């Protein structure tokens, strides 16, 4: 759309001394219509004092003449039309001296980053060549073309992406597991006879990205590093691990023994990237689908790691943070920090803000192995891997991204410290009781930005103007939260105290940002126009000069219109051609002789004048100075925010925890949950317990609640009943309620008395592992062995069908022996669902074993599953009836009944 000068800001009256609606002229300043673009900073500041700008006053930082409708970024490239097949598929096939200067530089950078996809800025595109072009074309389904590399070589593969779409395409590559090196232009005008200066400005890897579009908002993005010591005759396998979410600054280290423990931890962590210095590309302890990034062993050496830690955290000694006690973990965090530094080329005074490593000790959290996490469907469904249908989906009422991440971490690592659990539960209970408080807090939390990640981007020097505005908005809400919390939740977790009395420095920072940046700044910093008027005298002076130029352009349009007699003449601007006078074809005969034809279009002619061309240069230089000054002011502000990243994150984590607790309270209040009584004994007593997920998925029928009683003299429950009657659901709901209680949540039951568990084991369902050469039965036995080796009297064990993958008597014998061991030697609290009705006899042999059954009502040939668990053992499994209900052909069902009758006889 073309914008006429009439009715625009250019239509303002010519500024004269004391004219209405204009700033007064100053006698000793240059005439604005003869403006000198080389005014000194002092002159410009003087102008700003003489003609002060008010906040939100219109700025001249962007072109204000009419905009040409064809003023679009040129996204055409050379070398894209030839159909010749590129001849060279890999950069190593050629000698660098044979290549053109651009390709030679590309190859030099590629040799420094061989493991990464190199995107090389050429004009409006990021290009890839050789093997990277083939990769980019294949993975992103882009056209593979070629570029001429000289007569001796011919064409080489080339593929590219528009620079404005780089983040989206890089995000796709990161999600596919690739690392990306971005080579950008560092100057706009090359030195005479030289190429534009280019260099690597960002290295993006799955574990170190900071960009919002490359991260999952409600999930931590873990980068991990591991150091292992193989087992010897004198010591077991030992390992140290460091994990960091570079986007939030969270850093943890741990050191343990046993390769199984390492495998389980990595399976839970689901790190985006795992660093290690070994040669094996697929070590046995590494779960599938974890991306291994090999590194040199040097960063992991003890001396190198200590030096990196001392420098990064500006410490004199590591003793104060306890790392010498976990030497393997110390080496792991050293390698991780070195990698982060190598992949983050930062501006001066910028550093990715990372917390001092927190040591995770044994016994801090409830142990959940990978099988249990899958069976209980904590964060994803077992069949489809979807969030919907998982526990997290059912109870996540958080309103912020950081609150969502916090709740996920709590579910993945429930607490074992009773006092810490009760502190969370106390807050949940208080918020359930105080509905107005809960609703007010949720209203304040809803618009809160992701302060954790925003602060990280500011500290690393990657934050934009909108990021800083979001930080200020979030910080300005802290006093409102404090006012609501005052005297309300004082007996909650210690970290919540950060919200009761927000740091004054954070409020001062928020005020500074709000007074400096406009509320809705442009996305790109290069556009300018995001700093308020009145912030900086030099910037105000430049804007005054630009306003004067706008007035000159408006006057020039009027003069040329009057002089030519062309009433439809317009003065417009094009990003490539600059300022010009646009005249329709019908009026070209009236064009004055001193006009110079600039461009001919289908319906109009475009002209310039020497005076307009000269003034254009002045305007462009003033605008460039204004944009540069805005950027300088912004960088100063961003550094100021970055220095406060640690304090911002401390407040952000308190907000995240409050969001998680408020969400749990909302679930409890609206879903008829109860506050469990937590004990230090082994009791697990539930009245009218329900499955927190299934009851939400049921639409037409209500969920049937059931009781549970374990631990008070009853260690093993043998659960029998028909197929498809709900035994597996009953097992899972027990495990989920135990877990929710240790998260600090209320639970879906009428009443609950729950002793703290050290581990939850589940063996529900059966799958084979063909890749590992294991049958269904072998997988079942391996899982059972894991339980028997690691369960204690404080563990909760949930078993569904052991021994069914082999001969009947073999399976029964195994199931019997496992049951005896759990009830006798271990005394682990166990519910064992089985179709081996012979196991009901155990209750007559052991006082701590009880029989329960899932009830079914049989009327003629029909079965009605009641889903009610009652004392006693079932004598039938109704397998044939279940087969009929599943749609097995009637002839097969009838024959099965005949065979069953014969076997019974």
From Swiss-Prot:
SMART domains in alphabetical order: MUTSac, MUTSd
UniProt keyword terms in alphabetical order: ATP-binding, DNA damage, DNA repair, DNA-binding, Nucleotide-binding
Region (Disordered): 1-95
Residue stretches of biased makeup (Basic and acidic residues): 38-50
Cystines in this chain: none
Pfam families to which the protein is assigned, alphabetical: MutS_I, MutS_II, MutS_III, MutS_IV, MutS_V
GO biological process: mismatch repair
Record InterPro entries: DNA_mismatch_repair_MutS, DNA_mismatch_repair_MutS-lik_N, DNA_mismatch_repair_MutS/MSH, DNA_mismatch_repair_MutS_C, DNA_mismatch_repair_MutS_clamp, DNA_mismatch_repair_MutS_core, DNA_mismatch_repair_MutS_N, DNA_mismatch_repair_MutS_sf
PROSITE patterns: DNA_MISMATCH_REPAIR_2 (PS00486)
Keyword set includes Metal-binding: no
A GO molecular-function descriptor: mismatched DNA binding
Any one annotated GO CC term: cytosol
Record's keyword annotation contains Nucleus: no
Residue numbers binding ATP: 721-728
Family recorded in the similarity comment: Belongs to the DNA mismatch repair MutS family.
Function statement: This protein is involved in the repair of mismatches in DNA. It is possible that it carries out the mismatch recognition step. This protein has a weak ATPase activity.
Protein name in the entry: DNA mismatch repair protein MutS
UniProt source species: Synechococcus sp. (strain CC9902)
Gene that specifies this protein: mutS
